[in-house]
């Protein structure tokens, strides 16, 4: 073979027989390594941490559900050999639930429109990363990393390869509305300013409109004192509308503050319970 290799599994606190099987595989082949997390640290932190632990000239992260086709690896390496530091695998089609694929497509387009940093549509993180990029990731020390945004932000020489995403081969996803919302808010608060700017603009517009309406109301009342009766219903609707806007933007600001708070706490990406087939010289990066 032209290249040597290492295979690193990072287990996010599986509750089945995954760890038993990984130990058996690692025992047979010392080029296969494993990290067992002390708990489930989420769909972003765990694979990101795994990337930081690799030692090769390049790294290719692959999800264990086989929705990232390993058949693309030779094509990824070929593009890397051409001089690209990052090779992004981008979905053009997917065999997953069509409704979910449509919603994800809308999400990608929305974030791309709102973000101040270039965002790659239908990029899940599957691809190839040169060791120079991986070293920059280590230096970032981001406690809540979003690899899809970081790729577009740092400006390394990059290309894309298209593929059709197959169905999940085994197991069942643990993603639900909360985890998907959490992922969306991570990208939204990390790479967009529109939430805060929108609150400012809507507040200014509402204030200006309120002054105009008040002046018009006052003039109409002076001109038609007995006949002009606005009643309570418009006032109640206006108060409810303004109150809902306030709650919406307070919630958005809360999401930004939560993101800042997590970064300031600077907690480790993951906490390891065990690692297998790592040399003592290999420094753990958290």
Which sequence ranges carry the predicted segments?
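Conserved beta-strand scaffold positions in the cores of enzyme catalytic domains, especially
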Residues: 34, 86, 158-160
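A conserved acidic beta->alpha catalytic loop
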Residues: 11-20, 66-67
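Conserved donor nucleotide-binding strand/loop of the catalytic core
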Residues: 5-8, 19-53
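Hydrophobic helical membrane-anchoring modules
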Residues: 146-286
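Solvent-exposed polar/charged
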Residues: 27, 52, 78, 82, ...
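Acceptor/aglycone-binding surface of glycosyltransferases and processive sugar-polymer synthases
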Residues: 37-39, 43-53, 58, 70-145, ...
